[in-house]
Structure formats: C-alpha cells, structure tokens
C-alpha cells in the first residue's frame, strides 16, 4: 500500500450493483488511468513537500510527507493507492445551471396564485424600510446556480477493475468531469 492516498479520475456514469442479500446499491463508476510523477516540490526550494503528478493532460500537486517513496518517473494507479472497502472523499465541480431564480436557487416558497396576486415567483420583501434604507450584503437572491467545487465525503469503494472503480453513491459533476479522489 502506498502513502499517497489521492488520485485524479474522470466520471463515467452511474449504475447499480447488488450485494449478497440482493439489495441494489447505487454506484458511480470512475476511470483513473496511470499517473506519472513528473516533479517534486521541496521545502528548501518551494517551502512545502509535494509531488507534481500528470494524469492525461492534467497536472496537479499532491502533498506528501516523504518524497523518497516517489521518484520522478514512478507510475501510480488505483491498485497502488486504494483498496476495496476503503472510504474516500471526492472533490469535483458541480453541474452549472446558469442564472436561476430565488425559488430554484434557495428553495424559497412561491407567492399566492389566486385572488388577484401578481407575485407568483417574485422574491417579495428583501429588506427593512427607511432604516437601514439598504439591502444587507449576503441577502439570498437570484443568481448563478451550480458550477462550484463540492466535496462528497465517506464514499465506499465497492469494486476496482483495471483502471475503473465503483464508488457507492453519487459524485458531483457531469460525465467526463475531472474528480479528485482522496
């Protein structure tokens, strides 16, 4: 087992697996090919210790304590970093939904639909009156929804096959998105 517990992967899609009792388990299949160590970050030169790793056309840094275990040119894959039954965290960018109203973005209730009301999907009152005479910063309103980074913790590894891995549950992002598994 390697000390490095973080790799990059791409999302393949969701499926289901069955346990020994016949229960269906939702799984997300991710693909992670070979990672190559291409450089080191040392405390003397950079102020911290890390590996620079290439996966396909992405280059990322992974913090480690001992660089000696990872010479430049070493190849890493799923079987060297993870094992079945292990719990992992997955970081990825969520699906962007564009400009969304306050109901979809913040789950606010709608206005009345009858008796002459015209504010069906309006935000209603957004602040106080003459005092303070302004809208407080951070007030939840319509705006961009999604497209930000999210971490899902505690996903269990159910299967590892060659360069693919089945994680129990859902991971953020679309099919083909880059994931960081830790």
From Swiss-Prot:
Keywords: Chloroplast, Plastid, Ribonucleoprotein, Ribosomal protein, RNA-binding, rRNA-binding. It is found in: Plastid, Chloroplast. Coiled coil: none annotated. SUPFAM superfamilies: Translation proteins. InterPro entries: Ribosomal_uL3 (IPR000597), Ribosomal_uL3_bac/org-type (IPR019927), Transl_B-barrel_sf (IPR009000). One of its GO terms (cellular component) is cytosolic large ribosomal subunit. Its main location: plastid. GO terms for biological process: translation. GO terms for molecular function: rRNA binding; structural constituent of ribosome. Pfam families: Ribosomal_L3. Belongs to the universal ribosomal protein uL3 family. One of the primary rRNA binding proteins, it binds directly near the 3'-end of the 23S rRNA, where it nucleates assembly of the 50S subunit. Part of the 50S ribosomal subunit. This is Large ribosomal subunit protein uL3c. It comes from Cyanidioschyzon merolae (strain NIES-3377 / 10D). The gene is rpl3.
């Amino acid at each position: 087992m390697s000390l490095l517990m973080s790799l990059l992967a791409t999302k393949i899609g969701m499926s289901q697996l069955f346990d020994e009792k016949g229960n269906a388990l939702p799984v997300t299949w991710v693909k992670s090919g070979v990672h190559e160590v291409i450089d080191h970050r040392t405390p003397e030169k950079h102020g911290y210790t890390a590996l620079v790793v290439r996966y396909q056309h992405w280059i990322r840094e992974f913090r480690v304590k001992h660089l000696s275990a990872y010479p430049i040119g070493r190849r890493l894959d799923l079987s060297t970093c993870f094992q079945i039954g292990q719990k992992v965290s997955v970081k990825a960018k969520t699906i962007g939904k564009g400009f969304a109203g306050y109901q979809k973005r913040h789950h606010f209730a709608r206005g009345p639909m009858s008796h002459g009301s015209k504010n069906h999907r309006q935000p209603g009152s957004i602040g106080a009156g003459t005092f303070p005479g302004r809208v407080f910063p951070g007030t939840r309103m319509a705006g961009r929804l999604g497209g930000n980074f999210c971490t899902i913790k505690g996903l269990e590894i159910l299967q590892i096959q060659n360069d693919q891995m089945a994680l129990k549950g859902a991971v953020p992002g679309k099919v083909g998105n880059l994931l960081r598994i830790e």
